[in-house]
Amino acid sequence: MTSPFTRRALLIGALPAAALGLSACGSSQASSTASASGSAGGSASASASASAIPSSSASETASASATADDGYVGYRLNREVPGAGTATLYTDYQCPYCAKAEPKFEEAAKKLDGIMNVTVRNMPLNMHANAVPAALAVEAAEAQGKHLEMADKLFATQNDWKGIKERDKLRTLFNDYAKELGLNTEEFDKALLDSETIKPIQRDYEHAVKIGVKGTPTFAVNDKVIEGLDSSSSVDDLVSTFKREAGVK
């Protein structure tokens, strides 16, 4: 499958959904599924300009751990527990259902601290034009240890940036967010422009496709997609399901 995350694709804009290799759990079917289950489906998107978003590095509680096929598991939301099961949220920062799911997932991470690993990975959807730029902004913030702060900011302000079509305007707004969060805006903007910034997002996307993720939010335990959980699930439901799937009593 051809990757949608080449620099050329980022500069050109969105690729056709068919080129991304995912069924459109988010075309006509997605809206009905979303309203029924609280999750918005869709195929992954490459609609972003390299000048519209950032890269990142690790923080104590929300760090990007190195791996994928080399061990990468995404951003950690709690302490690493070697050998323990891993619960992962596949998210899209423009998805309104992800905005509802992530705070609960963060609470679940606290309850599972020292018991299970809890991580977040990217799954930008083709139906969301600014999903990749938003993911880039989170990556850029992570470079300064503020992945979680930027993610929360983007979820809280979705209506302010989701419809922006001008790349420079989007870039300026994300830089304003970075300033509000106390980031070095020069370094943040440099990360947005860096072609390396897209790589963790691409890695997350490819891994999501590999394990069968078709929409967001999607929860997985040890790379097994979990059915029956969505943005309407309670924190207790998340915790109990994750523990059961990981064999934790």
Sequence positions of predicted segments:
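C-terminal cap of thioredoxin/glutaredoxin-like
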Residues: 2-5, 27-37, 41, 45, ...
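Surface-exposed charge patches
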Residues: 139, 176, 206
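Flexible, active-site-adjacent loop/turn segments at secondary-structure boundaries
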Residues: 70-75, 153, 190, 224
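Structural alpha/beta surface segment adjacent to cysteine/selenocysteine redox centers
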Residues: 88-94, 99-173
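Short clusters of hydrophobic/aromatic residues that line enzyme substrate/ligand-binding pockets
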Residues: 77-79, 161, 226
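Extracytoplasmic thiol/disulfide redox context detector
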Residues: 2-127, 241-249
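Internal amphipathic alpha-helical segments of the cytochrome P450 catalytic fold
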Residues: 22, 147-151, 185
